[in-house]
Amino acid sequence: MKELFNILLINGPNLNLLGHREPKIYGNTTLSQLTHALTKEATTFNIHLHHIQSNSESTLINKIHNSKNNINYIIINAGAFSHTSIALRDALIGINIPFIEVHISNIYTRENFRSHSWLSDISSGVICGLGLDGYFWALRTAIKRIKKISTLQV
């Protein structure tokens, strides 16, 4: 029987508005459509994709804390919290689970305040500016890294 691995997908503030908010920047696909497609892709690799979206920093921090013993990898689009939340940074450092930071838009070509992320330097990697495709690249990379680690531990 193949081992089942778990990836946590975290979406921060305003990402619940995907498909409706600034479609020229974020596209027309809803968060529900995106997570459905990602879940389907993950399942083909025997990965269980867990998802949370919250506009509340404390909810995201609690979810991160509760992931310590059952999540193998995290994919996070912290939205605006990327630029403001040292608390999210500390939560991710505290659980020591590798993560990939994703941004739909290229944060380096937008307003100056968006060009700094408190998460980037502690992440395994950052994907930005690739639209929703960035989530799929992050998922594939996380799966590849999980599988590599699991074969090394056998």
Curated annotation (Swiss-Prot):
Its EC number is 4.2.1.10. PROSITE patterns: DEHYDROQUINASE_II. Pathway: Metabolic intermediate biosynthesis; chorismate biosynthesis; chorismate from D-erythrose 4-phosphate and phosphoenolpyruvate: step 3/7. Disulfide bonds: none annotated. GO terms for molecular function: 3-dehydroquinate dehydratase activity. It is an enzyme of class 4 (lyase). One of its GO terms (biological process) is chorismate biosynthetic process. It comes from the Bacteria. The record marks 21 as: Transition state stabilizer. It catalyses: 3-dehydroquinate = 3-dehydroshikimate + H2O. Substrate binds at residues 77, 83, 90, 104-105, 114. Pfam families: DHquinase_II. The active site is at residues 26, 103. Keywords: Amino-acid biosynthesis, Aromatic amino acid biosynthesis, Lyase. The keyword Cytoplasm does not apply. InterPro entries: DHquinase_II, DHquinase_II_CS, DHquinase_II_sf. Homododecamer. Belongs to the type-II 3-dehydroquinase family. Catalyzes a trans-dehydration via an enolate intermediate. This is 3-dehydroquinate dehydratase. It comes from Buchnera aphidicola subsp. Baizongia pistaciae (strain Bp). The gene is aroQ.
